[in-house]
Every structure is written in C-alpha cells, then in structure tokens.
C-alpha cells in the first residue's frame, strides 16, 4: 500500500566481525528494519574429535570450494563435508546466513534457500583418547555426531569392543550391546564364557535369541565346561550314564523332568537355546506318589499303597469349602466299619449260645384231675 524499499545498507559490528546487520529503509514514512546475518571470515584449523560449521550457506550461486576456503590446509586433510541444516542467504552477499525465519516485506527477491556448510573429522585413530571419550560417553565436548549418536551407527564398534572387554557391566557398554550388532555379541561371548553368572550376561543371552543364539550357546557351553560342579550348569553338563539314558527313554527329554532344567526360577541363560524352546513345549506334570510296597513279577508291577487313611491328611489346605469336601470321605468310611463290628458281635453271641452245655434236669410229670 505505497510501502517500497528505498535503500539497503550493510552495517558491520567490530566487536563480532562475523555478525552483521542489513538495514532496510522504506518510503512512505515506514520504520526501518534491521536484519541480522552472518558471514564467515575466520579460518578454522579444527581440533581432533570436533566438527566445523562455518557460517556459510551453500546456495545455487556458491560452491563447496568457497565453503572449504575457510579451512586451514591441515584441516582440509582431515575433514570432509556433509549435509548441514537448512539456511537462508542474501543473494547479493554470497554465503551469508540470515538469522530469522520471516523475511521482511520487500526483501523476498533477495533471499535464497540453501544448506549450511558442515565438516566432520574422519581422521580418527581408534587409539586416540578423544574418540574413546566420545564413544564411551565420558564427555560429549567437541564430539562429532557419528561418535555421539547412541550407537545407532557402527562407527564406535571397534573402540567399544576393546572397552567392553574390560568393563562389560558399564552403562555405555550395555547400551551398545542393546543395539544387537554382531561385533557386540562376539565381544560379550568372550566375556560371558568366563562370567556367565554376571547379570549383564542375562541381557546378552536374551538379545541373541532367537536370531543369533549361536553366540550365547557357545558362551554357555564354554562356561559350564569350566564349572561342572555348579548346579546351574547341570542341565547343560549332566553326567552321561546308563541310568540317565534309560530315564530319558522312559520319560522323554531331561529338560522336561530333571529339576536342574525344569526349575522355573532358573535363569534362561543356563539353558541352551534348543533346551529353552523344548521346555516351553513340555507336556509333563510333576507329582508325588507315596508307595508302601512295590512288587515286581516278571512284567507285572503291583503297587500297594495305604488307602484306608483319611484323604484329608494329604490334602493341600485351601478354602473352607474345599476342606469340607475333602473330609466327607473320612466320616463315611467309619459307618461300614461299625456295621461290620456289630454283625460280628451278633454272630459271636449266637455262636456262644449254640456252643453252651445243656443243663441236666429231672422230668416232672404233672397230672390234672
């Protein structure tokens, strides 16, 4: 509505040479506007373990060579350019970066879209203390993103493998293991071969199954071969003998009935993967049977148990209704016993009478007239 740009002026700031202002003047009595922008002037040498992002916006009118001119010769040997964040630049100030999202009225035609220059250091040695510091999360100062991205990429795998052999229980190592890369599995396979009882080995076994169970199985077999006297290993290293072989023929796989295998409180890391799978498919139900006498005659087995006792004696205590039902057979089992005893008493009584001697007596004749 009559507002037009009458003049554009660049204002430098001596205190911050790379920070400048664009003064936009309008006709019609409108107030001037100031736009802050940045222009690269410093030459960056780059410290080891850092990245360089000079205030230079790459647009269609600029080149990577212009952006790289702000790196020292030594830095150019170590750093490579990667995509940076989006930026806006003044067309008449190539490489400048505007410090605002909303473009003032009348200046739209002078603004170009681009991406900021960004360089990362690829000249890292895995023995360098800085890369170890970044990957092990000791400090994130000057750490490039490839070494501080929570192990999403494999750039830290080599250094973390050496670190986690020494400190496998540390939080960074466990976060690295959680990414489930094979180099981490190989590292923890070596550790858990000697320290399977450690809690981080439980995570290791869980992460390897089912796709990479070979790593955890190798660690379990190695550990249990060195600790045969450890009850936790008895499902894996059960002594081989004829008795066990016969039991397996009769009862099925030992993982379904051997206590060292069936104990639900046992950590899965003490079972091989196929044993762990087999245990979930077992159809056996354990129970206790009390036998008084066992008689074997050829192929006939005769079990003799004490059945006359109260059923309630072997009943697990539960709610009241269950106990009452369990005690009913105990009451009714007394009645037939009493009847039998009564019958025996009556029979004995009559037999006693029948067997008694006859009393001698004289015959008395009585006549009635």
UniProtKB/Swiss-Prot annotation:
Q: Name one GO cellular component term.
A: virion membrane
Gene Ontology annotations of biological process type = membrane fusion involved in viral entry into host cell; symbiont entry into host cell
Lipid addition (N-myristoyl glycine) is recorded at: 2
| UniProt GO molecular function | lipid binding
Describe the processing and modification events after translation: Most cysteines are linked by disulfide bonds. They are created by the viral disulfide bond formation pathway, a poxvirus-specific redox pathway that operates on the cytoplasmic side of the MV membranes.
Q: Which residues cross the membrane?
A: 331-351
Q: What is this protein called?
A: Virion membrane protein A16 homolog
* The organism of origin for this protein: Fowlpox virus (strain NVSL)
């Amino acid at each position: 509505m009559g507002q037009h740009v009458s003049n554009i002026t660049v204002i430098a700031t001596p205190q911050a040479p790379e920070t400048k202002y664009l003064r936009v003047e309008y006709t019609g009595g409108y107030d001037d506007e100031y736009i802050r922008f940045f222009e690269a002037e410093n030459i960056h040498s780059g410290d080891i373990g850092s990245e360089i992002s000079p205030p230079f916006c790459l647009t269609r009118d600029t080149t990577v060579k212009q952006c790289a001119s702000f790196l020292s010769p030594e830095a150019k040997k170590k750093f490579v350019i990667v995509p940076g964040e989006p930026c806006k630049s003044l067309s008449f100030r190539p490489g400048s970066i505007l410090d605002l999202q909303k473009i003032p009225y009348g200046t739209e035609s002078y603004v170009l879209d681009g991406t900021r220059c960004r360089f990362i250091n690829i000249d890292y040695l895995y023995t360098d203390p800085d890369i170890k510091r970044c990957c092990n999360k000791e400090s994130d100062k000057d750490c490039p993103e490839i070494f501080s991205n929570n192990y999403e990429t494999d750039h830290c795998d080599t250094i973390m493998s050496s670190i986690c052999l020494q400190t496998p229980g540390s939080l960074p190592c466990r976060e690295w293991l959680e990414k489930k890369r094979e180099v981490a599995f190989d590292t923890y396979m070596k550790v858990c071969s000697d320290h399977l009882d450690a809690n981080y080995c439980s995570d290791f076994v869980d992460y390897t199954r089912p796709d990479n169970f070979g790593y955890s199985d190798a660690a379990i077999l190695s550990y249990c071969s060195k600790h045969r006297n450890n009850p936790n290993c008895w499902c894996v290293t059960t002594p081989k003998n004829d008795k066990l072989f016969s039991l397996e023929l009769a009862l099925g796989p030992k993982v379904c009935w051997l206590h060292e295998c069936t104990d639900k409180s046992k950590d899965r890391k003490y079972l091989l993967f196929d044993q762990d799978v087999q245990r979930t498919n077992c159809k056996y139900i354990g129970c206790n049977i009390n036998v008084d006498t066992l008689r074997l005659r050829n192929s006939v087995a005769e079990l003799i148990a004490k059945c006359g006792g109260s059923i309630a004696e072997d009943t697990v205590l539960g709610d009241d209704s269950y106990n009452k039902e369990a005690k009913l057979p105990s009451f009714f089992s007394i009645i037939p016993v009493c009847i039998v005893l009564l019958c025996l008493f009556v029979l004995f009584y009559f037999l006693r009478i029948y067997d008694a001697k006859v009393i001698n007596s004289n015959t008395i004749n009585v006549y009635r007239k």
